[in-house]
Amino acid sequence: YVCENTPEPLLNLPGAFSTRLRAPRTGSMEMATYYMTSFLCEYSRALLERAIEGGYNFADCLITPDGCTMMNRAVENMELLNALGKEKEKFFFEYMEIPMKADDNGGSHEHYGIDISDKAIRQAVAEHNRVCELIRAIGEFRKGDKPRITGYEFHVITLATYAAPKYLIIDKLEETLEELKTREPDEKPYRARVLVVGSEVDDCGFIKLIEDTGAYVCADRFCYGSFPGRDPIELNRQRPARVCASGRR
């Protein structure tokens, strides 16, 4: 998937897992610029460039919400150019019209037989919320006068939760949280505590660059960060799929 507004639990049902598409260390974007023009943002063009290069051939489907126009153009070009799923008969693209149409997205069930029952969705939400709980707990260690974790380290850990299967990293996050409780704070003095706000900030090197200047990234609010992407999802008596879809910003 390509946007923070995609409801992750609906993509992380038993037998499936999601990964947020990135294009790290992108060089030339000539092919993507040819199809999308230079007026569109570098992030959307980098994704299309990587797709044309075959960097996302591991995927079995691509699901995207009706987010920004530039991201929609990137996905539309991927589909028109047949850049993904060339040798996968069941591959499909899906555009989610959320939150205006927050009903079930049954594409994964129709093509791959994925369980989309309420029970399966509630299980995926519980797993998602556990990841959110751990990330928020780890992030609390950034508040101290002498932080026990750097902003760069926190960004690397948070970024992993958008790319890896949740069930494979929960125990690693739990180990990290326990380690931080006894970790000796860095004696390095920071001249300023910085909040980084933006959209697709997925380059950990950018956070490291800020901290190498003497600042400390103590909080974040961007699409690959802990706010708002690692907000827990509170279920109620409604259909869980509807809650997941309508609850994303």
Language-model features, listed with the residues they occupy:
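Acidic/His-rich segments in extracytoplasmic proteins that coordinate ligands and/or metal ions
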Residues: 45-110
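Metallocofactor- and cofactor-centric catalytic cores in central/energy metabolism, strongly enriched
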Residues: 1-4, 8-9, 28-32, 40-46
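Extended, charge-rich low-complexity interaction segments
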Residues: 51-57, 61-63, 67, 115-127, ...
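A charged, amphipathic alpha-helical module
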Residues: 1, 108-230
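Glycine-rich, highly charged phosphate/nucleotide-binding loops
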Residues: 35-53, 249
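Redox- and metal-dependent alpha/beta enzyme cores, enriched for Fe-S-associated oxidoreductases
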Residues: 4-5, 10-22, 198-249
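Hydrophobic/aromatic beta-strand patches that form the interior of the parallel beta-sheet core
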Residues: 19, 63, 94-96, 195, ...
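Short, charged, surface-exposed secondary-structure boundary motifs
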Residues: 27-36, 103-106, 226-233
